[in-house]
């Protein structure tokens, strides 16, 4: 029976190639070569390339869901819980550099078709828990009551996700060639957490309608 390390090597190689060149351009033969195993061995674990791709997505998204979910089960106040979630999400994305590219390709090339079951599961569990934390903060008075918890949850995660997904552009905006240095990533994460918590607790901005009314008067 093949060693468990073979599975890890295959998944690592497949993840790197799918992220770098996409699902369609990646062959079983190339994955075997990258993993340093006979391509025939891949079929011992996975019946076809699509099942292997699903396994790659499941490994990363499943790990993300579990790790972030752990931060939502503690007894910290809502704002501290959300800060922990954001930091955990950033740590995951930074620690798995293929994940942002893999997700970007999945959304752009396949409209999230392969990841849809996992996204539904995350939406039903993790996303709803984040919304519940926001609602708890609103009920307790620590988070503004005028915010839609669903939009707020999307905004919190998106600003952290975009930093990693758009890394090639972000690095150049910040004056770097290649990846953003780890120390600078940490500074951005600190900024994003402070920025988010300030938005959740500060007074709401005047609406466009109210602004027009003041101008006319």
Label for each model-derived stretch:
Residues 69-101, 149-156, 186-189, 205:
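Hydrophobic alpha-helical connector segments
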Residues 80, 117-122, 139-155, 187, ...:
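All-alpha amphipathic helical-bundle segments outside canonical DNA-binding/catalytic cores
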Residues 88-91, 95, 124-140, 158-217:
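C-terminal peripheral helix-coil segments that are non-catalytic and often amphipathic
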Residues 10-18, 89, 196:
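Short hydrophobic clusters on alpha-helical segments that form packing/core surfaces
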């Amino acid at each position: 029976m093949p060693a468990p390390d073979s599975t890890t090597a295959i998944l690592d190689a497949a993840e790197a190639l799918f992220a770098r060149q996409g699902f369609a351009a990646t062959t079983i033969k190339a994955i075997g070569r990258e993993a340093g195993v006979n391509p025939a061995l891949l079929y011992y674990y996975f019946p076809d390339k699509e099942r292997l791709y699903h396994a790659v997505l499941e490994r990363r998204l499943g790990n993300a869901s579990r790790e972030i979910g752990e931060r939502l089960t503690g007894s910290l106040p809502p704002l501290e819980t959300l800060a922990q979630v954001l930091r955990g999400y950033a740590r995951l994305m930074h620690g798995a550099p293929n994940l942002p590219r893999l997700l970007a390709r999945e959304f752009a090339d396949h409209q999230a078709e392969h990841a849809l079951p996992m996204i539904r599961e995350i939406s039903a569990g993790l996303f709803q828990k984040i919304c519940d934390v926001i609602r708890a903060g609103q009920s307790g008075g620590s988070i503004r009551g005028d915010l839609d918890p669903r939009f707020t949850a999307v905004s919190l995660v998106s600003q952290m996700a975009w930093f990693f997904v758009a890394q090639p552009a972000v690095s150049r905006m910040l004056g770097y060639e290649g990846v953003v240095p780890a120390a600078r990533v940490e500074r951005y994460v600190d900024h994003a957490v402070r920025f988010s918590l300030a938005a959740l607790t500060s007074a709401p901005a005047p609406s466009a309608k109210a602004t027009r009314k003041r101008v006319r008067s």
